[in-house]
Amino acid sequence: MTAPPPELVQLTAGSMVERWTITKKLGEGGCGAVYLCTDSTGKYALKVEGISEQMQVLKMEVLVLNELTKRGSRHFCKIEDKGRYGSFNYVVMTLVGKSLQDLRKGTPQQSLSLACSLSCGLQALEALEDLHNIGYLHRDVKPGNYTIGRAELNELRKVYILDFGMARKFTDNNGVIRKPRAAAGFRGTVRYAPIACHKQQELGRKDDVETWLYMQVELTVGRVPWKELTDINQVGQAKQNIRNTPDKMFVHPCPAQELKQIMTMIDSWDYFADPNYAEIYRLMKQALQNCGKPEFPYDWEPGMPLNYMVK
């Protein structure tokens, strides 16, 4: 008989983890939960994970965030505290605001305004470039893994990237790119996964960027063409087919010309390629300029339609 899966760690409001007071649960994942906590300096997020969990996700999170903090990174949470308490490991980090997925779904059309989606897309790609620069891939890029900052910290224009549970180091200790494995399992979320993932190939930096492009389309239009498909192979096929009919993906109000150029660039890169982020930023800024709307305010700032979601 196999042992039952370990129970997720459950903390109650008012309980203490070292100096942190638990306020409420914010969410739950496969390996643990996230809580709102406070100390004398303010509000933070506390992530917990049982020490018997086979996948030690928090370990990767701490590794990545510590490395990024050394570089003074713009789009990442800061670790305030970490340790072991009773039967679980915990990390206390920056408390962020709503996810881009929640904000997108807060609109009747399920999409952000064009200027807002392009500006957030630029920040989302900056975050990936920073991550890649320290030798890590994210491998689960999606709107649910990006958030905005909190109004009380004056961070409504700041985009954070979260969740490094699927991250992988693609360089060795000397900064040399590791040889790709002959076969790699499926990683990530089917809707946004890159074609290489459907083929069970090793993922590289270009694959994070491909995934970012699908996310960009969804933020701008409200959907990707394969939204209704559930079969993993059909979704993979749809992504390949869209290369022949890109207009079916880059529908109004997408800046089709620029996004097509970006997709062509991504498709020309191989596993070892160092993505040309600068050229993508240039095309995104060009699209922003051409859309004829100001970059700011974002859709959730005071006086804007989504402001009700961040109060």
Residue ranges: model-predicted function:
Residues 147-187:
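Activation segment/activation loop of eukaryotic-type protein kinase catalytic domains
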Residues 1-15, 23-24:
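Juxta-kinase regulatory segment immediately upstream of eukaryotic protein kinase catalytic domains
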Residues 132-153:
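Catalytic-loop of the protein kinase fold
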Residues 78-89:
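Short beta-strand micro-motifs within the conserved protein kinase catalytic domain, predominantly
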Residues 96-106:
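Structural motif in protein kinase domains
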Residues 120-121:
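Activation segment signature within eukaryotic-like protein kinase domains
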Residues 23-29, 34:
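Protein kinase glycine-rich loop
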Residues 37-59:
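ATP-binding glycine-rich loop module of kinase domains
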